[in-house]
């Protein structure tokens, strides 16, 4: 099975940093993507807003220069998460971030 995604976009909301009870650092933010893709030989406007999380010791180094409005390229994998209120969503777990 393959689960790998690369998506460019803009940091849509301010970063939120947290730490788990076991001491793992996390950085959460929303990535907003807009592009024009070709589907069935026709141009299609694409828009999505996706939550991103960066975890572990490298989270601060990967996100230290990010602010709301930063244009970035994010690589990682997708995972389904269910919130405390039972609402589920796909989350991009990033392991590489570069500014563009």
UniProtKB/Swiss-Prot annotation:
Keywords: DNA replication, DNA-binding, Primosome. It comes from Vibrio cholerae serotype O1 (strain ATCC 39315 / El Tor Inaba N16961). GO terms for biological process: DNA replication; DNA replication, synthesis of primer. GO terms for cellular component: nucleoid; primosome complex. The keyword DNA-binding applies. GO terms for molecular function: enzyme activator activity; single-stranded DNA binding. Involved in the restart of stalled replication forks, which reloads the replicative helicase on sites other than the origin of replication; the PriA-PriB pathway is the major replication restart pathway. During primosome assembly it facilitates complex formation between PriA and DnaT on DNA; stabilizes PriA on DNA. Stimulates the DNA unwinding activity of PriA helicase. Residues 1-100 form the SSB domain. PROSITE patterns: SSB (PS50935). It comes from the Bacteria. Belongs to the PriB family. This is Replication restart protein PriB.
């Amino acid at each position: 099975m393959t689960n790998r995604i690369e998506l460019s976009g803009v940091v849509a909301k301010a970063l939120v940093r947290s730490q788990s009870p076991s001491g793992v650092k996390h950085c959460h933010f929303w990535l907003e993507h807009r592009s024009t893709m070709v589907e069935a030989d026709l141009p299609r406007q694409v828009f999505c807003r996706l939550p991103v999380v960066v975890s572990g010791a490298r989270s601060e180094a990967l996100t230290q220069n990010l602010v709301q409005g930063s244009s970035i390229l994010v690589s990682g994998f997708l995972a389904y998460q269910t919130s405390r209120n039972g609402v589920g969503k796909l989350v991009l777990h990033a392991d590489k971030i570069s500014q563009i």
